[in-house]
From Swiss-Prot:
It catalyses: di-trans,octa-cis-undecaprenyl diphosphate + H2O = di-trans,octa-cis-undecaprenyl phosphate + phosphate + H(+). GO terms for molecular function: undecaprenyl-diphosphatase activity. One of its GO terms (cellular component) is plasma membrane. This is Putative undecaprenyl-diphosphatase YbjG. It is a multi-pass membrane protein. Residues 1-27, 79-120, 173-198 are cytoplasmic.
Amino acid sequence: MLENLNLSLFSLINATPDSAPWMISLAIFIAKDLITVVPLLAVVLWLWGLTAQRQLVIKIAIALAVSLFVSWTMGHLFPHDRPFVENIGYNFLHHAADDSFPSDHGTVIFTFALAFLCWHRLWSGSLLMVLAVVIAWSRVYLGVHWPLDMLGGLLAGMIGCLSAQIIWQAMGHKLYQRLQSWYRVCFALPIRKGWVRD
């Protein structure tokens, strides 16, 4: 039943040779490049953010570590070929023929969006969740993922954020103090110059 649903949704979303070239180009940009918002925003929040923003970055890092491990485990337990490997649909994005479930891109961006929903602001989390859905759509549209690959990424992200909250409650303050002290040593000159926040 799930396989039939997966195939039906894929057939509805997947681009075809008749799709507008500009749509395919836009989808390629979204699928490949928009994920860079994750490291860029994390760096900005740490270097110029207040204590709350830096703690958010640490929580996100923990959540990502857990969710990617969960994703890796799920992929080994439930291996699934990509659509183009099975000669289903149309592929418009070069990709290795490795397992597709769950999506690494989906795992990362959904974890990031869920983290902001849980620990930052509703508006920022909602905006990032829209971005996550758009990235998920683009990778199915281009034929490198199944819809359920993205659902798997969302599930991994939920587990990652829940685990990060538990870990933070147990040792978050000590972890923040340790990382903050390392940061002050490594970035002593930029901090002294006022280029980044202490």
